[in-house]
Amino acid sequence: MTEERIEAILGFDRVRKIISDRCSTEYATARTAEENFSTDAREIRQRLLLTDEMRMIVMFEESFPSNGYIDCVRFLEILTNEGSNIDLVSLGKLKTMLETLRRITLFFSNIKDGIYPNLKKMVSSIVLFPEVQQRIDTILDKFGNVKDTASDELYDCLLYTSPSPRD
């Protein structure tokens, strides 16, 4: 019997669909689709531990970020090309996503050892680059607009489609 057939008989195909429908980004939806059916008891146990820890966080931890999960993959992939740049909207999205990552890592660093150990271990591999967020903060205000203190050249580059109000 194939794994797809076993998955359908057990109803996990429907569970996958329910989870996929609740995903807030294209990346999360794709990751859900890529998850493979498993019969390995060790892997199933690990997945259940992660799921249960996240369920507990969602139910009881008010300080865990519930928003700010933005799909940045498309414009970050473009930035790997030499000479590419980022538009103002994408820069604002990146700022939000970096802040969410910072808040997630802060949440787990403030949690006592032994609480949510599996998720804490998973999050421990996240590397933050505060310089990037600080640099974005020198460019954008809290509303995602170019700050008045941004250089004239940067201001004009980011707003090339409209005349600079500084003129």
Question: Where do the language-model regions lie?
Answer:
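Conserved small/polar residues in nucleotide/adenosyl-binding loops
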Residues: 160-167
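Charged, surface-exposed helical/loop "interaction arms" that form contiguous linear patches used
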Residues: 145-159
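Conserved amphipathic alpha-helical "coupling/scaffold" segments
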Residues: 1-146
